[in-house]
Amino acid sequence: MAKKTVTRIAKINLIGGQAKPGPALASVGINMGEFTKQFNEKTKDRQGETIPCIITAFNDKSFTFVLKTTPVSNLIKQAAKLEKGAKNAKTIVGKISLQQAKEIAQYKLVDLNANTVEAALKMVLGTAKQMGIEVTD
C-alpha cells in the first residue's frame, strides 16, 4: 500500500451547516460532496456562523479537516449588533462592554496564541479598536 502524502493544506472560511461545492473547494482537490456532507454534519449546531476550516488534502483525494472558532471580528460585530466595522479605526461606529469582550476572549482562548484570558482579552480589545468599536466598562 502506498503511503499517503499531503498534497495541499488550505484554510477557508465557510458558513456553518451551509457548505456547498464550489471554486474554493475545487482548488483543494478533494471529494467536494463528501467534504460538504461531513462539514455540514459537524457544524449543524453552528448554523449561519463563519467557521474557519483547515483542510489537509492527500494524494489519494482523501482529506482531514479541523474546525476553528468564529473569527474575533465576527464575534465583536455580533456583540455590537453591526453589519461591519469602521473603514477608519478612529471613527467610532459602536460599543461593546468589557464583559462582552471578556466572554469573546474566553471563547477564543483555544484558538488564540495566548495562555491566559487576560492576554486573549488584549487581543480582542486590539481588534475592537481597529474596527472602530469602543469598549466601555
Curated annotation (Swiss-Prot):
This is Large ribosomal subunit protein uL11. SMART domains: RL11. InterPro entries: Ribosomal_uL11 (IPR000911), Ribosomal_uL11_bac-typ (IPR006519), Ribosomal_uL11_C (IPR020783), Ribosomal_uL11_C_sf (IPR036769), Ribosomal_uL11_CS (IPR020785), Ribosomal_uL11_N (IPR020784), Ribosomal_uL11_N_sf (IPR036796). Forms part of the ribosomal stalk which helps the ribosome interact with GTP-bound translation factors. GO terms for molecular function: large ribosomal subunit rRNA binding; structural constituent of ribosome. CDD domains: Ribosomal_L11. Part of the ribosomal stalk of the 50S ribosomal subunit. Interacts with L10 and the large rRNA to form the base of the stalk. L10 forms an elongated spine to which L12 dimers bind in a sequential fashion forming a multimeric L10(L12)X complex. It comes from Mycoplasma genitalium (strain ATCC 33530 / DSM 19775 / NCTC 10195 / G37). SUPFAM superfamilies: Ribosomal L11/L12e N-terminal domain (SSF54747), Ribosomal protein L11, C-terminal domain (SSF46906). PROSITE patterns: RIBOSOMAL_L11. The keyword rRNA-binding applies. Keywords: Methylation, Ribonucleoprotein, Ribosomal protein, RNA-binding, rRNA-binding. Belongs to the universal ribosomal protein uL11 family. GO terms for cellular component: cytosolic large ribosomal subunit. PANTHER family: 60S RIBOSOMAL PROTEIN L12 (PTHR11661), LARGE RIBOSOMAL SUBUNIT PROTEIN UL11M (PTHR11661:SF1).
